[in-house]
From Swiss-Prot:
It comes from Rhizobium johnstonii (strain DSM 114642 / LMG 32736 / 3841). Pfam families: adh_short_C2 (PF13561). Belongs to the short-chain dehydrogenases/reductases (SDR) family. This is Galactitol 2-dehydrogenase. Optimum pH is 9.5.
Length: 257
């Protein structure tokens, strides 16, 4: 097999949570372009419109409506795919929410629990649901969306709940990688820097923060969703066949300083 062919995903079936927008949409596009059939999980059909539009380019993209915090729904989708004869061989746990600017002492119980439910529980529910069929097949690749915030403490904005949720995702990644390696399943994560997404740009306070972020970044720029998706594609592909338990920084050098 040529080196270029190692990046191909022909015959694979990928599931991308939150795959209809921003980073998730780019992951959907990257995997589909590499030859995978992609199932996007979004909370509504409307959220998946851009992903479905990829069909116009000849890509195999389907949508399932569901919330990653609903473990039973994730189990049902995984079972449906497996019973239909095309179980997921790739899972990208992309769905997540952000939170910044709230001091720890002002976080409500609801703020904290919501962050953990989406960013951590959702990753585990999906990994467990789709991992079962991967275990049966003795192969699979899971890529989690972590964050550099799982390693460092951001400034100037306080974001304790988000940071903790992503640190937990990183260790969940390592734990599943160690436990499932003998099943032929690789589990890795990407840890992006600040990315130009609607979630980041829409926060008015970030207009003052961005110059400070860039001053803390060796490459002096934010990332793009496409750059994150490229790393996800690599980890999902055979080109990363010896990698498991890795947390890959896609951070413009932010964590170097």
């Amino acid at each position: 097999m040529s080196y270029q062919q190692k990046f191909r995903l022909d015959g694979e079936r990928a599931v991308v949570t939150g795959g209809g927008r921003a980073i998730g949409l780019c992951c959907t596009e990257a995997l589909a372009e590499a030859g995978a059939a992609v199932v996007v999980i979004e909370r509504s059909e409307a959220d998946a419109e851009q992903a479905l539009a990829l069909r116009n380019r000849g890509y195999d993209v389907e949508v399932r409506v569901g919330d990653v915090t609903d473990a039973a729904r994730m189990d049902a989708i995984a079972t449906e795919l497996a019973d239909g004869g095309r179980p997921a061989t790739i899972l990208v746990n992309n769905a997540g929410i952000g939170q910044s600017g709230i001091p720890a002492q002002d976080l409500t119980d609801a703020d904290w629990l919501r962050m953990m439910d989406v960013n951590l529980n959702g990753v585990f529910w999906c990994s467990r649901a789709f991992g079962r069929s991967m275990i049966s097949m003795k192969r699979g690749a899971i890529v989690n969306l972590g964050s550099m915030s799982g390693t460092i403490c951001n400034r100037p904005q306080p974001q304790t709940a988000y940071n903790v949720s992503k640190a937990a995702v990183h260790h969940l990644t390592r734990s599943l990688a160690a436990e499932w390696a003998h099943h032929g399943i690789r589990v890795n994560a990407v840890a992006p820097t600040y990315i130009e997404t609607p979630m980041v740009v829409a926060v008015e306070a970030n207009r003052e923060r961005i110059p400070l972020w860039l001053a803390d970044t060796p490459m002096a720029r934010m990332g793009t969703p496409e750059e994150v998706a490229s790393a996800v594609l690599f980890l999902a592909s055979g080109a990363a066949s010896l990698m498991t338990g890795a947390i890959v920084n896609v951070d413009a050098g932010f964590t170097c300083w």
